[in-house]
């Protein structure tokens, strides 16, 4: 008998057996729908705070879709809702909540309040939950007892930090039959690569695979019928630290998982899209080692919908099939309940953003600022050099759609210009290390996302993209003289870079055993006021008026023959 005929016979036999079991009253069948979000980044309602326009984003639209699904449920259906992290950073609403903590009580953060109203069953920590310290995370999530972080380990107890839970065990009903679902939550252990240690003091982050394996064992002992994992990490990438994204590793090591919800990479993954691992392996239908994978982009633009078809025979539940899809919220109305709930904070944020901090006597244009020298990146770099007292500064164009128009400068414009809660560092580097830094930057020229590509201020240089990687910096001069390997410089950079983000520190040879000499630390000097965005605001307030100036200290050539 041929292979296909064998499979067809097995399938027919299985269906016949299930049908017989159902007719004799010994089996139950139904669907578990798991809605998932990830990297919502402070988007509650359908509004873009940077452009001051309505947008197809946010939990309010997600809520509408979920409510519609609830209305269509039958007794054979059940539902779970899970978020995979990066909640407390990303919009000026989040920024307002951080800067005005005296205005709200523990648990009243609008993101976590929205999660409660919508009815989320589990929420996983993302790396941005640690941007503002453990106390802030605890305050924001105080009324949510389902915040997960199994691999966030308390240094004193060597157990899961008490501000989170390793997992939850939910009991739901399908056609009156109890189904116990275990949900494990983990976060990328690479947080020390992009976060200041003071913000996670007292905890450390361990590899996800053994933690999830342990969680599976414990949940099985507690009677879990099926187990889902939600990880704030994505599919492994060749351009990132191997610890940062661990989805393929988790799926290969944990075939017991019925579903793996992932995040962090801001991409959409479902059955319609295959997954390509760094080794070139393609996983058709986004299924790895039998484990279905789903990711729902960012900002609440999509909601993941994973439907698990289950049956129960002789007391045992089995997952027969899983389909995953990412549903766009485009054109979906905001849930008025969520809108009303967040309105006081939304209105306060809008008022906050309209503050005028200075004046521009010309336009600073964001377009192409990631491809050529620009006044907008020069402004950031000059401020970083001035504050840190360094000879050089490196910065990226975080939002090429944001301009500073001629006339009054508002906080809204500056929030759109510098969208992250970064701090500022100054370090010592040699000429050889500086060249390695710039060669590493050249590898990111013309790629996405923009935040990986740094531009240098204080030195003159040329990038020849026609040359092989590692040899593209054909000119590197400081004050008119060629930079020599033994030269010494001071370099300003944000804390994401300083802590290893995008691999620049590794490229220069810095690591835990060979740290750089720090000459400036805005966290130590200024506390929360040391965020780069705040430094930009303070600079413009002091100047009163700024002028767009481009010094044309760098250029990229050889673009047509780029290798």
Predicted regions and their residues:
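Short acidic, glycine-rich surface-loop motifs adjacent to enzyme active sites
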Residues: 36-45, 79-90, 181-193, 213-238
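Core catalytic region of metal-dependent phosphoesterases/phosphodiesterases
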Residues: 67-157, 253
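Conserved beta-sheet core of the metallophosphoesterase superfamily
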Residues: 83, 122, 139-149, 242-305
